[in-house]
Amino acid sequence: MEPGLWLLFGLTVTSAAGLVPCPQPGDAGKSGVPGTPPTARSEGDIQEPVAMTAVQGPSPRSPEQEQELGRFGEQASKGGPVHGRARRCTCFTYKDKECVYYCHLDIIWINTPEQTVPYGLSNYRGSFRGRRSTGLFPQSPQPSKWTQRCACVQSQDSACLHFCTRTLAVSRNSRTATNPDKEEEPASRGNGGLRPTR
């Protein structure tokens, strides 16, 4: 067991020796490294500029990266933690799995024998039941075949707007194609379809 302790001690010392404290703007004379000329420093201090660069953080971001942070991490401007992936839009129902996969990029799906459970939709604003509507919107008196399935976070995100409006009509058509007997059953009774014999 003693060699294991020595190994742990050696790794601890090695990792601690590689850390160099980053001087803060108000810490003029408080840094741990004395201000000696470069010739008087020891051999271990040669790596200091590299370590200081690593501790100070990455170089300034490009405009594309700043735009991505603005799009996906609104907390960045508020000083909060920035997550690499965030939601693109908010689905109106959990049952629309395609929408949940599209909108909530950081979703984790847990498979259970009974059902697939969504986990991680903490900021979901809809109800668990699917929306029922006749297709009429208050602003348009005629029936609409394009109903919204989600609400985009950014109003300028044309791909998201296209997905949230167009794809719902496609999924409705595919649903009737997968279950044609539910749609045709009432129609066959009215058209003189199969009737029970007396």
Curated annotation (Swiss-Prot):
The record marks 109-110 as: Cleavage. GO terms for cellular component: extracellular space. Residues 150-164 are annotated as: Endothelin-like. Pfam families: Endothelin. InterPro entries: Endothelin, Endothelin_toxin_CS, Endothln-like_toxin. GO terms for biological process: intracellular calcium ion homeostasis; positive regulation of smooth muscle contraction; regulation of systemic arterial blood pressure by endothelin; regulation of vasoconstriction; vein smooth muscle contraction. Keywords: Cleavage on pair of basic residues, Disulfide bond, Secreted, Signal, Vasoactive, Vasoconstrictor. GO terms for molecular function: endothelin B receptor binding; hormone activity. Expressed in which included heart, lung, liver, kidney, spleen, stomach, pancreas, duodenum, colon, uterus, ovary and testis. Residues 1-16 form the signal peptide. Residues 17-86, 110-198 form a propeptide. Coiled coil: none annotated. It is found in: Secreted. Disulfide bonds join 89-103, 91-99. The keyword Signal applies. Residues 22-79, 174-198 are annotated as: Disordered. Belongs to the endothelin/sarafotoxin family. Endothelins are endothelium-derived vasoconstrictor peptides. This is Endothelin-3. It comes from Canis lupus familiaris.
